[in-house]
């Protein structure tokens, strides 16, 4: 039985290393670079940039651009990534799928990850597509990832704060996440709980 919420509230959930047990971009790198001789070194560079950006050690936008430049991934790699991520959804979200579906209008995914791999994984557990806020890739004519949509607020430094502030959520807000960018929502007074 699903417990009824006592008040109107929103749950803002990060995707990478929260909704799933892994970092999507890091795993995409492992898939895309599988046959490359410098795979481990490049994947480690991407992981290091991910950690530095999440911890606020370097500007997020800089970390994102550097990671994308190292990827060399395409749409086929994204399909493989989605299949992999579907096996890596965190147990707590799998166990609480009924809650996710019952309160779908109040659950938001706010991620610096990418819609191309977040949407198919999150919607399978009841998250509404219109409640998924994430970056989007830019592709060339061959389907190779060549960048990110830099106009998307989540591709910018402080993107989560800017996005949630613009939402003007008039309710109790709980943030579920693992990184500094998630904590910033609480720090800036946009969340009641972190």
Regions found by a protein language model. Name each.
Residues 9, 130, 173-174, 192:
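Conserved acidic residues
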Residues 155-183:
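Conserved Lys-Pro-Asp/Glu-containing loop-to-beta segment of HAD-superfamily phosphomonoesterases
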Residues 102-108, 171-173, 190-194:
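Short active-site oxyanion
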Residues 2-136:
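Alpha-helical substrate-recognition element adjacent to the catalytic core
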Residues 129-161:
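Glycine/Thr-rich beta-alpha phosphate-binding loop at enzyme active sites
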Residues 83-87, 150-156, 171-172:
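Short, flexible loop segments at the rims of nucleotide/cofactor-binding pockets, characterized by
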Residues 185-188:
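Hydrophobic residues within well-ordered alpha-helices
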Residues 115, 138-140, 181:
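Surface-exposed, flexible loop/turn segments at secondary-structure boundaries
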């Amino acid at each position: 039985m699903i417990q009824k919420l006592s008040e109107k509230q929103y749950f803002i959930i990060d995707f990478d290393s929260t909704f799933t047990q892994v970092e999507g971009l890091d795993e995409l790198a492992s898939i895309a670079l599988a046959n490359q001789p410098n795979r481990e070194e490049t994947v480690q560079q991407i992981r290091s940039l991910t950690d530095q950006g999440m911890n606020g050690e370097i500007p997020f936008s800089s970390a994102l651009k550097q990671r994308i430049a190292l990827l060399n991934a395409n749409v086929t790699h994204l399909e493989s990534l989605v299949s992999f991520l579907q096996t890596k959804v965190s147990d707590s979200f799998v166990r609480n799928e009924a809650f996710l579906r019952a309160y779908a209008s109040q659950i938001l995914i706010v991620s610096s990850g990418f819609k191309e791999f977040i949407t198919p994984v999150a919607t399978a557990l009841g998250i509404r597509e219109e409640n998924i806020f994430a970056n989007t890739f830019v592709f060339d004519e061959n389907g190779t990832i060549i960048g990110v949509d830099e106009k998307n607020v989540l591709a910018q430094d402080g993107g989560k704060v800017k996005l949630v502030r613009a939402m003007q959520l008039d309710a109790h807000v709980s943030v579920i996440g693992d990184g500094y960018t998630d904590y910033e929502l609480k720090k800036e007074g946009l969340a009641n709980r972190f």
